[in-house]
Design a protein with these regions (language model features):
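Hinge/cleft segment of the Venus flytrap/periplasmic-binding protein
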Residues: 34, 186-187, 284-350
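Extracytoplasmic "Venus flytrap"
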Residues: 37-65, 70-86, 94, 100-104, ...
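Periplasmic-binding protein-like
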Residues: 40-42, 93-101, 120-124, 165-168, ...
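Short, solvent-exposed amphipathic alpha-helices that sit
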Residues: 49-64, 148-152, 174-191, 208, ...
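Flexible loop/hinge segments that line or gate small-molecule binding clefts
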Residues: 68, 105-147, 161, 254-262, ...
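Structural motif
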Residues: 69-95, 194-216, 230-232
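Hydrophobic alpha-helical segments within soluble ligand-binding/sensing domains
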Residues: 82, 139-164, 205-206, 253-257, ...
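Hydrophobic alpha-helical
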Residues: 99-116, 183, 198-260
């Protein structure tokens, strides 16, 4: 009898434990369920590792705000493919959509299918604040490209530079030319005659830069528009024996650029703080969903008051700039003086 009672008691305890375990798992599953489902669609090809920082930022924003964000991009960087991805996003009825304005004219029709369904829209990275407003976005998060180019050009002008080569690895993106134009107008020269459509193959970029500099020996400076053009240009300058002699600046950042800043090949990198372009739009859409508001002022207040967001900024040494409607992620400048701090998180969060 005692054995039977013990067995019965054990069965009861086992059943109770199973129920408690099931309840705990159910509670965890409920807690883990995301509050919203967003998508970020970029123009970047798979080969562009610069976007890894943005992908990492998306993951951290998802964690901090308990949401899920898909990342989509055209594998080869084809804008027509990007347009189709946007149309697919509209059809899937996401809780929010984030897009780059790689080509306003090509993408506006696809983006209109998102806003026609009253799906909250944020634009990032490429494009202008004016284009963002025309598309019906809540806000734009990015770096004003012309302003950034001009700021870099003013530094070049102060160094006595009067001529330059703009190495454009993404000429299919109209916004990319704003960087060249801003730099050129700071110097007082024509950007069209100074811009090289270099393509994205590293060997081709290196070859084209070398050929241009041989054919234009009076060129005093080089401006690269990102790692895909900067890294091969570094090799070209070193191979030609002019590294450190030719004034050289670039947009964006990676470990090769960091080394070139440290050894004097590159004067500075124009930092658009890409982490902010991944984190902030996800955070904004989460606030829109939770607080039922599209008011930029209220969204900014909620964002700035969020301790998890502030902790991320402090850890990675980031500083957004806030406008009346939009949030700026740059430009900042990475030089010999601050490159070591940035390098600590390069390729991951900087």
């Amino acid at each position: 009898m005692r054995l039977s009672n013990r067995r019965g008691a054990l069965r009861v305890l086992a059943a109770a434990a199973a129920l408690c375990g099931a309840a705990a798992l159910s509670s965890q599953a409920a807690h883990a369920a995301p509050d919203a489902h967003f998508v970020l669609i970029s123009h970047a090809p798979d080969s562009d590792s610069w976007w890894n920082t943005i992908k990492n930022a998306i993951k951290q924003a998802d964690e901090d705000f308990n949401v899920q964000t898909d990342y989509r991009n055209p594998p080869n960087g084809d804008i027509a493919d990007m347009a189709r991805l946007i149309e697919q996003a509209a059809a899937r009825n996401y809780d929010g959509v984030i897009v780059t304005i790689a080509d306003f004219d090509v993408l506006k029709g696809s983006i209109s299918k998102v806003t026609a369904k009253h799906i909250p829209l944020i634009t990032i990275n490429s494009g202008t604040e004016e284009q963002s407003a025309q598309l019906g976005a809540i806000m734009h998060v990015g770096q004003p490209e012309y302003t950034a180019g001009k700021a870099a050009g003013e530094k070049a002008k102060a160094a006595g530079i009067k001529s330059f080569l703009c190495v454009n690895h993404y000429a299919t993106n109209p916004a990319s030319f704003e960087r060249c134009r801003g730099f050129a107008e700071a110097l007082g020269v024509d950007f069209k005659s100074s811009t090289l459509d270099a393509g994205q193959d590293p060997t081709t970029v290196q070859s084209k830069v070398s050929a241009y500099l041989r054919n234009h020996p009076d060129t005093q400076a080089v401006l690269a528009l990102g790692p895909l053009s900067a890294d091969p240009t570094i090799k070209a300058l070193k191979q030609m024996g002019v590294a450190g002699k030719l004034w050289f600046a670039t947009f964006d950042f990676d470990t090769d650029i960091a080394k070139a800043i440290q050894d004097g090949t590159i004067q500075f990198a124009i930092d658009q703080q890409p982490y902010l372009q991944g984190y902030i739009p996800v955070a904004v859409l989460a606030i829109v969903k939770k607080d039922h508001t599209t008011d930029p002022v209220k969204i900014r207040q909620a964002l700035e008051a969020n301790p998890k967001f502030q902790a991320r900024l402090s850890t990675y040494g980031l500083a957004p700039s806030y406008g009346a409607r939009n949030i700026g992620s740059g430009p900042g400048f990475i030089t010999k003086e601050n490159v070591d701090k940035v390098l600590k998180y390069a390729g991951q969060y900087r």
